[in-house]
Amino acid sequence: MRHSLECIQANQIFPRKQLIREDENLQVPFLELHGESTEYVGRAEDAIIALSNYRLHIKFKESLVNVPLQLIESVECRDIFQLHLTCKDCKVIRCQFPTFEQCQDWLKRLNNAIRPPGKIEDLFSFAYHAWCMEVYASEKEQHGDLCRPGEHVTSRFKNEVERMGFDMNNAWRISNINEKYKLCGSYPQELIVPAWITDKELESVAGFRSWKRIPAVIYRHQSNGAVIARCGQPEVSWWGWRNADDEHLVQSVAKACASDSQSSVGKVSTRNSCRGFPNAGDLSDVEFDASLSNASGTESLALQPQKLLILDARSYAAAVANRAKGGGCECPEYYPNCEVVFMGMANIHSIRRSFQSLRLLCTQMPDPGNWLSALESTKWLHHLSVLLKSALLVVHAVDRDQRPVLVHCSDGWDRTPQIVALAKLLLDPYYRTVEGFQVLVEMEWLDFGHKFADRCGHGENSDDLNERCPVFLQWLDCVHQLQRQFPCSFEFNEAFLVKLVQHTYSCLFGTFLCNNAKERGEKQTQERTCSVWSLLRAGNKAFKNLLYSSQSEAVLYPVCHVRNLMLWSAVYLPCPSPSTPTDDSCAPYPAPGTSPDEPPLSRLPKTRSFDNLTTTCDNMVPLASRRSSDPSLNEKWQEHGRSLELSSFAGSGEEVPAIDSLRRPSRLLGGAELSVAAGVAEGQMENILQEATKEESGVEEPTHREHTEVPEVKEEAPLAKESRTAAQGSGVLYQEPQLDDATLRSHLGPSLSSFSQGIPEHREVGHSVLSSSLPASLRGEDSQEVPVEQPQVENIAEDRENVVPAVPVDVKIGLGTSESSPLLPSQVPFETRGPHMNNSVHMLLEDKVKSESGPQLHHRPCLASSGRFSGKDMLPIAPEPRSAERPQWDSVLHRTSSPGNTLSLMMQAPCALPLDKCRQRIVCNGALETENKASEQPAGFDTLQKYPTPNGHCANGETGRSKDSLSHQLSATSYSSAHSCSRNLHHKWLNSHSGRPSTTNSPEQPSRSHLDDDGMPVYTDTIQQRLRQIESGHQQEVETLKKQVQELKSRLESQYLTSSLRFNGDFGDEVTSIPDSESNLDQNCLSRCSTEIFSEASWEQVDKQDTEMTRWLPDHLAAHCYACDSAFWLASRKHHCRNCGNVFCSSCCNQKVPVPSQQLFEPSRVCKSCYSSLHPTSSSIDLELDKPIAATSN
């Protein structure tokens, strides 16, 4: 009851503070998280600075700084007007102010904000969780489990004991002596010890070990039974104390290992027994009986176990010096059959000084002359090398020598977890998975009491700077070194580790609060805060390493020399990331067969929006290099799955919609969607798609007949070249540059059938084009069931030289002045567009076909139908809708040439509706889905819709896929994004559910696109982005082949039905009824919506929906949104559509409309698709248009 009260009264427990603006015109330059409230907004010198209860945000002209308050270690004023902020992750931030008084004001504010909390509830993680729960409390479902880690974390101890195969009958047992932490407050409640060691002996051992941290087993090698144990140092002191129970326990660990390995059936052969236990001889199972549960039974064993390795992380001098403080080390004389090794690792004070030296070095000038020598003098890489060598020594002992190992340092909570966690990571592939790594951190760092609060400085009144040390960061750096040496052995990527570094200090999540599990239990952090694993979950593709192979090395043996280690630049080195979106750029990959140093001819180089494209091209300025602040290449792929629609084309007097300053994906000619992120040249995407196609598809290499003309194009004069570029652009602008040939060919099928029926003299040609565009394996060349006739491709190709000059050359497209203007498709190099980019040829050829095919339509084709060009009408007459109002991929005109140089003319059945009746989505069964009107969107969505989600859908919930059966589906398959965790999803959810108005538009808003769900900068990895592109290309090829197979099957069925109708004399009636249906203005007319006019399944499906009530999909079966495919988690809730019964996220199911078919006559929640079909058609007047770009002539 108390917890529910906390959720309801979150705004009273954690109230928002009053916003203080230094300038009334200033706005908060970021989207706030749940429970976050901005307290101050002001102006620095050439920057906007904002301070909330979670972060400090400084937006400069060319970059921005976004850092959680708890990540800031100190703030000081330098040079009177400059604030100097030192961060705990090695970053240093400098901010200049115009006046001394203003600098002092912000110095006081920041010092008050970063001060260690007086009570733990002052940390932001508690307010964040409470406000999250308050938002969720308004819903009927329970969402508390989404803040929690997975079952693999909560049940980690039991699962690990079973997974590692401990013999709990004879060798080991689980002791509950530390239940409720009554023995040791920094140890877990359950401990694995030898089976014959009693709890009384453990209590005696606890009195002899530092902080009562007794030897406890934490890992077992599944093959040979050798274990790793950890503990604190023995309290020998100057008096040389000893403890018989402690000596017995240490020796019993080695004996239990031998017992465990021998008692496993077939675990150790005679040969392996002799190798593992050289003094044991041939041992039989008779020597092991069930009486091992008491000490007397073990004494009777005639077993000689392996020699136990005691690894002391300290140097021998430090261990002896600790005897003056009551500590010490094991004396070999008192511990027979044990070997003591000292590793000489530095203590926390030396590590802290080394890290401070590294931080000072990394904040110097970008290219110091003595960089390498200065880096060596910090000894940071040297400390990493020693740590790796220590872990590798444990791996050698356990894996190769089959010896048990006992690890300790002084207290056992700093260097000890570093060594044992790194050793387990090297030994066991499970810990190199996302789930296994979470378990590893929970068990070795959290359960065994690493003092995160003291080491990170966010504990209650933790003002002692001598207790602070980046111990966990140092260990993560070692994991990063392993990732570099073994790139295929880790399921998670570098972004995963970077996020973990940030949230070790950020206090957004409660995972790393307090010093041990006992304190976390007392503060109820698990119930009152969110877990960091809810963000770094296994299903989040943003943190997945695409190079990972589960069949990689079982045990890793890294090279530990300093010369083989590298500085972790993503964490330590300052970088301009994330900068403002206008700085985004990415150097294109060189085209196959070209030198990367020489730009290809006739190729417009990548430039900034303020550059002169023509001048830059003529001067051959080198291509801009990619900066870390530039947008992800994956964003191109994220937009690949979005809906695509073609507008009707008429006169050239209309203006072209522009790209606004907030970088929304704009719509250019013909409804083609172009990403406004000026980061990737279209030619680069073509190269990527072509490479993926060549690698994955079995299609033969295309003939290069049409490319023989390319040298002539390259030889043209500059004026002719410019004219050619403009001419090509006029016919290409409506085409999405990301689409490759395979994707466009996937839309062959019913559309061509419908078109060919209207043109009898070209019916055979169109049918053969389809067949020739399919792979040989799908055409079934050995089969004679579908006889086709190859078209005369040569004649069509020969006409190209005569057709291209006919395109008007005076048509130019103005780029406007927006900083975020992308490269237009007309600037794509001629030779890199691929066969399907030369649409001016296809356009004119279609006109030629039209002129030969009989009478023309009297009505203008609608947006969803085939948009045709005339010889004089090159620009669209109608402006395009906003990105938030894009229709699906249904009923799209595709023009392409197949890889075999076969020209494919693909046309949808034309729509006879007037233009104002055609702004609708067409689904396969004939239902028309209208566009959402801007006036019907909830408050706050005007801003949110400007940020596309990784799945290619806008934040307001516009879906980009249709989930109908494949045989009746025209829309292209939407592929899952590499970033399933949508950016700023927390913030969108807050604005859409809590009713809090979003911040107004301001020049500061573009910086939001660089902030992730957690309010932190987005980390991008170009290698992983390239791998995601290849993976998407592969998936695209697979889906294309599946679609082609299905469409071929549907075509065969249609052909069979056609022949049957001809035989019965009914075919003529079907054909003659087509013009009537095209002229029919009824929205339920099916013949213009479905390309399978003879399909009976679609009619059966409609009848079934009319007669049956919709059954809801159970909650537990839905892990992803049915529309945008985003995973359900902390910031994405489940909602049922009352019409179709599927489960959607809140953005995709936020409309309400009566559903009479389900007996719901009051407005009920429905998805976007159902809302469009149930709501009256929106007029084109309601569609808000983007800022137009004037079409000017140069």
Swiss-Prot record:
User: What SMART domains does the record tag this protein with?
Assistant: FYVE (SM00064), PTPc_motif (SM00404)
Q: What residue intervals traverse the membrane?
A: none
List the GO cellular component terms. Answer: cytoplasm; cytosol; membrane
ZnF (FYVE-type) intervals? 1115-1175
Which SUPFAM superfamilies does this UniProt record tie to the protein?
Answer: (Phosphotyrosine protein) phosphatases II, FYVE/PHD zinc finger, PH domain-like
Q: Where is the composition biased (Pro residues)?
A: 589-599
Point out residues bearing the modification Phosphoserine: 4, 609, 629, 643, 647, 904, 1060
Catalyses which reaction? a 1,2-diacyl-sn-glycero-3-phospho-(1D-myo-inositol-3,5-bisphosphate) + H2O = a 1,2-diacyl-sn-glycero-3-phospho-(1D-myo-inositol-5-phosphate) + phosphate; a 1,2-diacyl-sn-glycero-3-phospho-(1D-myo-inositol-3-phosphate) + H2O = a 1,2-diacyl-sn-glycero-3-phospho-(1D-myo-inositol) + phosphate; 1,2-dihexadecanoyl-sn-glycero-3-phospho-(1D-myo-inositol-3-phosphate) + H2O = 1,2-dihexadecanoyl-sn-glycero-3-phospho-(1D-myo-inositol) + phosphate; 1,2-dioctanoyl-sn-glycero-3-phospho-(1-D-myo-inositol-3-phosphate) + H2O = 1,2-dioctanoyl-sn-glycero-3-phospho-(1D-myo-inositol) + phosphate
What keywords are annotated for this sequence in UniProt? Coiled coil, Cytoplasm, Hydrolase, Lipid metabolism, Membrane, Metal-binding, Phosphoprotein, Zinc, Zinc-finger
Please give the Gene3D superfamilies that the UniProt record associates with this protein.
Answer: Protein tyrosine phosphatase superfamily, Zinc/RING finger domain, C3HC4 (zinc finger)
Show the domain comment: The coiled coil domain mediates the interaction between MTMR3 and MTMR4. It is essential to bring together CEP55 and PLK1 during mitotic abscission.
Name used for this protein in its record? Phosphatidylinositol-3,5-bisphosphate 3-phosphatase MTMR3
**To which species is this protein native?**
Rattus norvegicus
